[in-house]
């Protein structure tokens, strides 16, 4: 395994650890999710480029589309929660309150 793949896997693990540790604020959770999606995108792109597997060349673009949709939904949820409660604490998101 090359050094580039090790660095990308380390970036993914750091973002995952950040998501697990800093889950009190919604903004930090969204940033960690974006870091995870970015590292997955780079890993998929490098793997497809190195293996010359042209049939799967659309997979990184599809992953990028899902990351953009996730970011848009996350930011709209952040705006709604911060306008409603005044803070971005995840503990304010209770599905039973509706």
UniProtKB/Swiss-Prot annotation:
Some GO term, biological process aspect, for this entry: which one?
ATP synthesis coupled electron transport
Q: What is its EC number?
A: 7.1.1.2
Where does this polypeptide localize? Mitochondrion inner membrane
Q: Which UniProt keywords apply?
A: Electron transport, Membrane, Mitochondrion, Mitochondrion inner membrane, NAD, Respiratory chain, Translocase, Transmembrane, Transmembrane helix, Transport, Ubiquinone
**Pfam (any one):** Oxidored_q2
Tell me a Gene Ontology molecular-function term this record carries. NADH dehydrogenase (ubiquinone) activity
- TM helices/strands, residue ranges: 1-21, 29-49, 59-79
Q: Where is this chain primarily localised?
A: mitochondrion
Annotated membrane topology: Multi-pass membrane protein
Highest taxon in the source lineage: Eukaryota
Return the GO cellular component terms, semicolon-separated. mitochondrial inner membrane; respiratory chain complex I
Catalysis: reaction(s):
a ubiquinone + NADH + 5 H(+)(in) = a ubiquinol + NAD(+) + 4 H(+)(out)
Task: Describe its assembly.
Answer: Core subunit of respiratory chain NADH dehydrogenase (Complex I) which is composed of 45 different subunits.
Chain's role: Core subunit of the mitochondrial membrane respiratory chain NADH dehydrogenase (Complex I) which catalyzes electron transfer from NADH through the respiratory chain, using ubiquinone as an electron acceptor. Part of the enzyme membrane arm which is embedded in the lipid bilayer and involved in proton translocation.
What family is this? Belongs to the complex I subunit 4L family.
What is this protein's record name? NADH-ubiquinone oxidoreductase chain 4L
> What gene is this protein a product of?
MT-ND4L
């Amino acid at each position: 395994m090359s050094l580039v793949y090790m660095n990308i896997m380390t970036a993914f693990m750091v973002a995952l650890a950040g998501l697990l540790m800093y889950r009190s604020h919604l903004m930090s959770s969204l940033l960690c999710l974006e870091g995870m999606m970015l590292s997955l995108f780079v890993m998929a792109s490098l793997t497809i480029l190195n293996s010359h597997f042209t049939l799967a060349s659309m997979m990184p673009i599809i992953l990028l589309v899902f990351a953009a949709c996730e970011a848009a939904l996350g930011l709209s949820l952040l705006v709604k929660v911060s306008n409603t409660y005044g803070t971005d604490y995840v503990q304010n998101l209770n599905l039973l309150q509706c």
